[in-house]
A protein has these predicted regions:
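Acidic, glycine-rich A-domain
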Residues: 1-228
């Protein structure tokens, strides 16, 4: 509680007193707030387009959220997603060896990363965030499958409230897949995954778009036009 006549001096309001000594000192009272038993999953796009400032900002957000929420006794899971190769991997080779049948679906191998599991302490897992910025890790992004994977991890947890936050800078892109499937193949699967979670799951889904308007896909979303 703020703007009280007695209690703990509110240091954040001291500048107002310095500027105008006629302003009264402000006091506050701290109260314990009971958080609902909560777990938060942070799912980070680890594709090549995130290279540089964007992935640095994502890592900083993960660091701040992880430390802050752990102090509030909220469990945090930090995940990432990309592909194992550029322009196809073993999936594409298997398709070629099978005489390239039509409508093959995904033709790259997904890479899903656990930087911090919900049950790990922050002190043990924090250094893993540095791996997020390794150049050789950041390749292509197949978002729909990553959402389903992250959702399936969190939905079975015992906490009462489950929140999943996605940080991404664009639509799913995998050149090998899109060359031989409809151009909206990966986007349509992403929409399906979002709809499944938003309409049929107890998990609360939110998204942050970095330089990309994700409000077209997610019901609860914000867009950051510049990673700065």
């Amino acid at each position: 509680e703020f703007d009280l006549e007695e209690g703990i001096l509110d240091a954040a309001r001291l500048t107002q007193v310095v500027v105008d000594p006629m302003n009264p000192l402000a006091y506050k009272q701290e109260k314990e707030t009971k958080f609902r038993d909560t777990v938060v999953t942070l799912l980070i796009d680890s594709s090549g387009s995130m290279r540089g400032r964007s992935i640095t900002i994502a890592a900083m957000c993960a660091d701040i959220m992880g430390r802050t929420l752990e102090r509030c006794s909220v469990r945090v899971e930090i995940l990432g997603f990309t592909t194992r190769a550029w322009r196809g991997g073993e999936s594409r080779e298997a398709w070629i060896n099978d005489n390239k049948p039509s409508n093959p679906g995904r033709l790259n191998d997904v890479r899903h990363i656990v930087y911090k599991s919900a049950d790990d302490s922050w002190s043990r897992s924090r250094r893993n965030l540095g791996l997020m910025m390794r150049e050789e890790l950041l390749k292509e992004n197949i978002d729909g499958e990553a959402l389903i994977w992250a959702h399936n991890r969190v939905v079975t947890r015992p906490e009462q409230r489950k929140v999943m936050m996605v940080i991404s800078d664009g639509l799913p892109v995998d050149n090998s897949t899109l060359l031989v499937n409809p151009s909206n193949f990966l986007e349509q699967h992403l929409k399906y995954a979002i709809s499944m979670i938003e309409d049929h799951s107890p998990v609360e889904l939110v998204a942050i778009g970095i330089g990309h308007d994700v409000t077209h896909h997610y019901k609860r979303a914000v867009t950051i036009t510049d990673a700065e």
